[in-house]
């Protein structure tokens, strides 16, 4: 995909990449970035990242790399509770719509966990009574 992105951008690259896949796409995502581009790596769907060689992988194009997690956005219980309250209020009033990709019966909870751990799920899943 990096070659296609570079072709589409006349070899300039894109200003930012949001990569939630992880190991399988990380280095190709870096290739897509333009000079001083921003790599936002936020997931490990294909597995954890290999160690990053900053002089080889980041420095040549002066890239910026961030790996945000919820811990940086909510630094204490009060902030976390407020954030959760805000999200649930938006869900309740239809400002955020959640499409459940799979439902499991409570009796199938073990299967739900196995599917989650083996990365078979693509989206929110719920266990129902």
Features from the language model and the residues they span:
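Terminal helix/beta-alpha structural elements that buttress the NAD(P)+-binding lobe
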Residues: 1-129
């Amino acid at each position: 995909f990096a070659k296609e992105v570079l072709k589409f951008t006349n070899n300039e690259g894109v200003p930012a990449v949001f990569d939630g896949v992880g190991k399988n796409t990380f280095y190709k995502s870096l290739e897509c970035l333009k000079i001083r581009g921003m790599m936002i790596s936020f997931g490990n769907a294909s597995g954890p990242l290999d160690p990053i060689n900053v002089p080889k992988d980041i420095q040549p194009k002066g890239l910026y790399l961030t790996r945000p997690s919820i811990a940086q956005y909510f630094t204490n219980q009060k902030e976390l509770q407020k954030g959760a309250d805000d999200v649930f209020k938006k869900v309740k009033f239809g400002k955020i719509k959640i499409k459940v990709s799979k439902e499991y019966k409570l009796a199938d909870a073990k299967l739900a966990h196995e599917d989650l751990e083996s990365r078979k799920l693509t989206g929110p899943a719920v266990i129902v009574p």
